[in-house]
Amino acid sequence: MKLERVIISGGGTGGHIFPAIAIADEIKRRFPTCHILFVGAEGKMEMERVPRAGYKIKALPIQGFQRKLTLSNLKLPFKIIYSLLKARKIIKNFKPQLVIGVGGYASGPTLKMANLLGVPTLIQEQNSYPGKTNKLLASKAKAICTAYPNMERFFPKDLIHYTGNPVRAEMVDIIGKREKAIEHFKLDADKPTILVIGGSLGAKTLNKAIKHGMEKLHEANVQVLWQCGRLYHSDMAISVDRRNLSSIHLHQFIDKMDLAYACADVVISRAGAISVSELSLVGKPTILVPSPNVAEDHQTKNAMTLVNESAAILVEDQSARSKLVNEALQLLENVSLKQELGKNILTFGKKQAAEQIVDVCISIAKKKWK
């Protein structure tokens, strides 16, 4: 079946937005004339990132529940009702063959209204432990595409398609790029490289741990390619400059992630869904430090899925300052463990995730509106 009109809803974080855009790109690759409309949440990241990727987006006034008693919480029931009504209007006006939910605040009202209007829905779950919205909406979905195996304990078995997370292809294309990467980042080809990545904003714990262990890393004749994030760059830059450590290569943000992965001997990362999916495709020995500041503690669950299969090492957030650098240096020296981790993490990689998800979309899409 030809896809002509599709709504994709959700967002809030890059972990929701980037897979959504990857799915949209694959739909457009196969069906260039398909009209795709995104539905996001007011004031969230998707309202900026989606138009930048070339797609139209409409906003719902939806928000999450705050743990503290606030005026915002008192307004929440009214915002939910208004978001449901607005989502209904958007769907009736756009007349999609299919609504895809990727998680995040906006996906709840949009998928709920699509189900009530008889529009097929597909849920794309990025994590090994689903969010509450996806679990609530799963029974009414026509299909659920998961990033991890063994998700039957959360979703109806007959609806599950184990596709993996769609990632940007250029991010994981690393073969034959090590020499180019060394030149690009001005690294020493004779030194082992530790890549540290904590997201575009940065990860406070990772930054503190690397800052604490900079001298030890330098003395060990190891170089560090370090993405510290926008929020921490000025403070970390002062620390690096003050110590005059030539082996510490600090970046606010790395936009050439293919080159960063290509030159890395060991990777230190948070355990967000998309980071884990990218790491599973590049096959680098990895130390994961899950963020404790996420819903359902899903980063720890993502990490443990790999750790239980000897595909990654876990360092807990509260232990990172004292343990992380030592763990990384020990891993660099352990050739057999590096090989084992690199080999095992590849078994979680799904190169054709976007293509498989679009195949499922085609199989469940509505032929036409009456």
Task: Locate the predicted segments by residue.
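Structural loop-to-beta junction motif characteristic of Rossmann-like glycosyltransferase folds
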Residues: 55, 119-120, 265-266, 283-291, ...
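Acidic donor-binding loop of glycosyltransferase active sites
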Residues: 96-98, 262-277, 284-285
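Active-site-proximal region of nucleotide-activated glycan assembly enzymes
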Residues: 56, 115-178, 187
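Donor-nucleotide binding loops and adjacent catalytic segments primarily
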Residues: 44-45, 49, 53, 176-183, ...
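A short, well-ordered alpha-helix in the C-terminal region of glycosyltransferases
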Residues: 337-351
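Conserved nucleotide-sugar phosphate-binding/catalytic loop shared by glycosyltransferases and other
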Residues: 3-11, 30-79, 84, 232, ...
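An aromatic- and histidine-rich active-site surface loop
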Residues: 44-48, 98-117
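C-terminal alpha-helical cap of glycosyltransferases
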Residues: 350-370
